Amino acid sequence: MTIKFLSENTINRIAAGEVIERPASVVKELVENAVDAGSTKIDIILERAGKNLIIISDDGIGMTDKELEIAVERHTTSKLDESDFLNIHTFGFRGEALPSIAAISKMLITSKKQGYDKAFQIKLIGGNEKQVTISVHNEGTKIEIRDLFFATPARLKFLRSDKTELVATVDVVKKIALAHPKISFSLTHDDRNLLKFKGHNKDVETNLKQRIIDVIGDDFIKNAAYIDFKTPDFSICGYTSIPTYNRASSEDQFLFINNRPVKDKLLQVALRVAYQDYLARDRYPLCAIFLQIDPQLVDVNVHPAKAEVRFHDPNYVRNLLIEAIKNALTNTSHVTSTTIASDALQLFKNHLVNKQPSVSKAVSVNSKPTDYRPAMSPSFKSTPNTDCQKLIDTLPHAKIEQEVERRIEREQQAHKQYKLGAAKAQLHTTYIISQTEDSIVITDQHAAHERLGYEKIKDYLKTEELIRQRLLIPEIVELPNERNADSLYENREKLYKLGLTLEKFGEKSIIVTEIPNILGDVNVQKLIHDLADHLSDFGENIALTELIEHVTETYACHYSIRAGRKLSADEMNALLRQMENTPFSGQCNHGRPTYIELKLKDIERLFGR
């Protein structure tokens, strides 16, 4: 077969295969173009999740007839300066989107440039039959895409159900809307309005906060820490959830580089490391985090869809993001999710409704069964018992009254002075009930004390080494490859401080001679393999943090107050005071709350007061 040049239309269809995977890809490319055009309002209309029709309308700068003709040709763009290719500030720059979409659909573009009298229209079918005509339109651009993938039926067969494709498009619009709070967005599907975000024109922080409420919800903002972190060439802002407000998946994690939504493994690892001490491995925080970096320090031209980026110094970026998130979380370290109390109150309400007695079964307070007989009670004379009176007379009344008054005063001060209030009771020898000025607090004594122990051993490890236990028979661990063995050996000094002593044994094996004493009868093979995997996948930060977490969790669990142990009032109050002075005491080591606060006004509502 001889080598030959491909036709322009074939080239565009190949490019479309890289850039346009589904209707959501079309919406992404065209909405980003509208953003680059300086739009303040962008409307999206879909039919059958975009398979039949996609319309994107904006009030941006618009195009002339000549610009319309050029715009649908490959590698034409108004956004890229050839002399400064690395300094990219716009979303689009490759000049591939419009011709690629046109090659696999029926496209109609109508546009009127700002300051011009006439509007123009260009029509393309499968990338051909380009016709520019005069039209009528407001300033801005409207692009209609019909019968997507009609020219590539094989790609059409790979599309998912309308519901699945629509979910993907909604996700795309939400991400772009988050990055541009000043722009109004609307999304309509089959004549049903799905999204409507009004543009916000206040200060940057207020705009961002309001748009996050629009997209993710008010509950997230109420349970999130604000991030504001800056270096000379780097800034991070946004919101990230407190540990007790988490999800079972990472769907609600929105990460942006220079306002570009990205799915970047390095950033996801940094997020995981930042929450390492506070969340179980199968739980995920919610976040909307925006990283602003000098465009010359990040390469966005890694993938045609521009979903991936490459950093000039990835470790620097990762460490900054970890530090920024941890700093933000420190400011909310004693807070638990606001939804926990409301969920608990809802359970109470449901229980009250389900257990409400019917009218026919209701019993009058004053009614008595027919066979009721009052129990015989001891007879008391109106004059006091002489022996009792003598005993009472001998008691130091003044001292008793003073002590009672002092105790009442101390408790009243505790209600006002301490966030977790004064302990009042212990429920089922597991939960501490305390009272503040306007609420009651229920504390899980085991989870709370476990967290206190966890933080204590973490502080200890900053300056001290763990006690090591020498294995009677050194364990030889064979690893999958030489790289895993080398990475473990390179970190042997750090591992030694954590109580793990190892030596190289051949190309792919490690000999373990000592383990942290606190771990006891641990599976050494699994421990080393897990460490090697984490070093390989995520780097030393998260791998060593995994080991620290394993050690500290074991220590904290072994030495914490168990559920079922009876505590005195002084012990309960001492635990509450320690919690108030310990970072991140609001959640256990797995992200579950250590206490729940029920406001008095909410309790009163339960009783209809």
Swiss-Prot record:
Q: Per its UniProt entry, which superkingdom is the organism in?
A: Bacteria
One GO MF term attached to the UniProt entry: ATP-dependent DNA damage sensor activity
Q: Please provide the record's keywords in A-Z order.
A: DNA damage, DNA repair
According to its UniProt entry, the protein's GO biological process terms are: mismatch repair
Please list where the region (Disordered) is annotated.
364-386
One GO cellular-component annotation of the UniProt record comes to:
mismatch repair complex
- Pfam families recorded: DNA_mis_repair, HATPase_c_3, MutL_C
InterPro entries this protein is in?
A: DNA_mismatch_repair_CS (IPR014762), DNA_mismatch_repair_MutL (IPR020667), DNA_mismatch_S5_2-like (IPR013507), HATPase_C_sf (IPR036890), MutL/Mlh/PMS (IPR002099), MutL/Mlh/Pms-like (IPR038973), MutL_C (IPR014790), MutL_C_dimsub (IPR042120)
Question: Could you say which protein family the record assigns here?
Answer: Belongs to the DNA mismatch repair MutL/HexB family.
**Role according to the record:** This protein is involved in the repair of mismatches in DNA. It is required for dam-dependent methyl-directed DNA mismatch repair. May act as a 'molecular matchmaker', a protein that promotes the formation of a stable complex between two or more DNA-binding proteins in an ATP-dependent manner without itself being part of a final effector complex.
Give the protein name, as stated in the record: DNA mismatch repair protein MutL
